[in-house]
Amino acid sequence: MTFKAFFIRSIVLTLSIVVLVVSFNVCMNEYGLFGDVSGKSIKIYGNERTSKYLLSFNYIPANFDGLLIGSSVSDNIDSKEFVGCRFYNASINGTTVAELKILVDNVLAKGDLKCVILSLYPILTESDEKRTTRMVPREYWGSLGSINTLDFYRRKILINMGKMYDYFDEYGRYDYNLRKAGRDSKRLIQKEAERMSPNEPIGINDRAYADLDSLLKAIRASGIKIFAYYHPIPQEYFVMYEQSYRTYKEKLNALFETPDVVWDYNTADFLDFRRDHTNYCDHVHLSRKGIEFITRDINRKLASQL
């Protein structure tokens, strides 16, 4: 065989493999990117940021008319229990407003949302960084065949074999409580309180603050109802930065308008909840008991406003 013939055969073989891989991934449509996916149920098996980014192009707008957005403190909330709309939990572990805005913008471009629930917690506005390089357009085409795609199928196989936790459902909930069962939340809360100093500061990044303002304006411009709540912080260490929290809350409240529904779980009305360590699975994230309480309270507000 001549070098030329070998080269041509190699090119043809390579192209054939590429076509097969792309065709397979289009057929599997694991992120709901292609065609009509209304009525489909798609779970996350790969990286949360990448997955929710890709799902926001088509799957979420095709199947949901409500969003729950926030950081890890709302990531484990079962949004299918909410009333009034079909809510997708688009919260992301350790996220910032800059990342959430990418997801929301994608959904707004194609979807018909009625309602957005925003979980407010200091991590959202402490930085303007995007904490990944994987929420970018190249990931759209990378879903047709890349290292990330291989990792996706590896995780899916291991989860289906029972070798890894099945954390996510088709509503986007990240049920990390599965791995936190049995943790001593009282000890973890006390440890967090010991770590903090009196008058612990809560920083707000200027660009992150502007991102939040831009996000809220974009949601309102689409005629979508905004609900926002301040995540309940365990009282034992909430007192360590209560003064700076007031400043933080006043600044964020200035971004909301009269039609928006905003409330705070760190007021005296919810003191008993925040003193009860069993409402938490660690130092700040909610236990199943805590989630049930918060869900019931949110549903009362949804039922009266939608």
Segments predicted by a language model, with ranges:
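Extended, basic/helix-rich recognition subdomains
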Residues: 192-258, 263-265
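Alpha-helical transmembrane signal-anchor/signal-peptide segments
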Residues: 28-51
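Hydrophobic membrane-insertion alpha-helices, especially the h-region
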Residues: 8-29
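Short extracytoplasmic
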Residues: 44-70
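Extracytoplasmic/secreted proteins, especially bacterial periplasmic and envelope-associated proteins
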Residues: 99-102, 145-148, 152, 156, ...
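C-terminal regions of proteins
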Residues: 240, 248-306
